[in-house]
Amino acid sequence: MVDSYDDSLDGEKSKSQVKRELHALVDLGERLTTLKPDLLNKLPLTDALRRALADAPKHVAHIARKRHLQFIGKLMRDQDTDAILQLLDQLDASTRQYNERFHNLERWRDRLIGGGDDVLEKFVGEYPDADRQQLRSLIRQAQHELAHNKAPASSRKIFKYIRELDETQRGLR
């Protein structure tokens, strides 16, 4: 009779599991090397890891960069990776929200330029502080530029104006 014995029941991790976890730490360290210094300061990191992350851009040769990332991965073993991942997820979520809001404003700009008074009325309904006269003037200029293949200066002005309106309405200004 052959007994099958499962090592995972002992509570010890398999060699493969340990390797996967170490590779995940190296990947997290590589992700940290792409962050700006002011964002890194918000993370709970040791001084040695901060120095290693600051030195990362100096290593441009492939093997040197790989070796340095392995070193960062080694330093990551002493970190609270759950807290770091949680903060990185919050940063990603805020970036996603910002991009979503930005794309929404671009869609408004495009609809205003391509649409008529009904689109303008919908916009003013959503942004009551909007100056209709200024918007109409900018829309006419943008339509003229579009028809004559000129640079979209008025289109940029419309976007800037509706972005300022949005920020004011959200209390960011």
From Swiss-Prot:
Any Gene Ontology CC annotation: cytosol
Q: Which GO terms describe its molecular function?
A: ribosome binding; rRNA binding
**What's a single GO BP term from this record?**
assembly of large subunit precursor of preribosome
Compartments, as annotated in UniProt: Cytoplasm
**InterPro entries recorded for this chain?**
DarP, DarP_sf
CDD domains xref list: YjgA-like
Q: Where is the signal peptide?
A: none
Q: Which superkingdom heads the taxonomic lineage of this protein's source?
A: Bacteria
Keywords, sorted A to Z: Cytoplasm, Ribosome biogenesis, RNA-binding, rRNA-binding
Cross-referenced Pfam families, in alphabetical order? DarP
The record's comment on protein family reads:
Belongs to the DarP family.
- NCBIfam families of this UniProt entry? PRK05255.1-1
Q: Which HAMAP family match?
A: DarP
Task of the protein: Member of a network of 50S ribosomal subunit biogenesis factors which assembles along the 30S-50S interface, preventing incorrect 23S rRNA structures from forming. Promotes peptidyl transferase center (PTC) maturation.
Protein name listed in UniProt:
Dual-action ribosomal maturation protein DarP
Source organism (scientific name): Pseudomonas fluorescens (strain ATCC BAA-477 / NRRL B-23932 / Pf-5)
Gene for this chain = darP
